[in-house]
């Protein structure tokens, strides 16, 4: 059997899968030392495939009296308070109560093979195959919460919302992954256009998991999706109070806080949030683009804004909204001819976006292509812009961009 695992060397992925399951097979018969060598990367390269491989390796190290190394591994890969099962494993190792029980039978091993394949294919073009493997894994190991979560996520991604919700609900309250299941159920309700039900689920979790920053982050995301920015900011503020000292994984929290504060009209605090997010993750294109775009919109620090957006474009050259920001920054700097190419590219990537079409219309107007400008503005109106933007676009069609800008300067 072990030789079969070694023969799985067709490519890097199959080799990693083969060695991972060889390690699990060794651990199942009590050969923890050789299992540890494989999972530690001492043989055939480092292995860290799934959350399950982290749990298995930590349990194996604890069996070898490597408790400190096991705790270091968990702390490196998972934040406290973000994963109840890993928090419990951490506690058991600290108290000397951990024992290896991740995979102990052939049936569990086959289920883990299927789960690993489903996990590896998730997000690829083989979603149906991924779901098939996940369903088979769940049939062999019906009470395995991690498999249930993956299957539910795949069902949600394929818009089988009722089946996904039903599957999430099979994880009981006493399971360490119940919180993850409930958050997944809430996210599925949002995807199914039932935000009020999702928010009700998350509000109940906020009562029962008062110290979970993850719950308040999810609640903030749900409110933000409904443009309830005051409630979203309150939830994010609560999450911030629970995280302790921020690290690189917390950039999204400060990014979303910045969005809420900007929408609520508190620009100084919003800029502070965005710059904190950027300190935590300096090369994150979402932050670079959003902050850069807002600086351009406010006509502040334009050169810094342009450099931020150019850096974001370099990271995501096929992102329509980021390329739109680049074109708009050039437009704001008065470089109208230079703005044409990125704005046209942005419209190619996001043809149905009202803001991008409106921006291209403005660029065309400034270079004298007024008939094309009006065409783009009419397209923008057809894509249902927000009321404030709609009024401004109609005004531009009536009197032209130059007159609208002149009137705005007088205010």
Describe these PLM feature segments.
Residues 6-14, 40-49, 75-82, 103-107, ...:
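Solenoid-like repeat scaffolds
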Residues 24, 59, 119, 153, ...:
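Residue-level recognition of tetratricopeptide repeat
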Residues 30, 65, 125, 159, ...:
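Residue-level detector of the short coil/turn that links helix A to helix B
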Residues 89-120, 354, 366, 370-411:
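Terminal, low-structured helical/coil segments at or just beyond the last alpha-helical repeat
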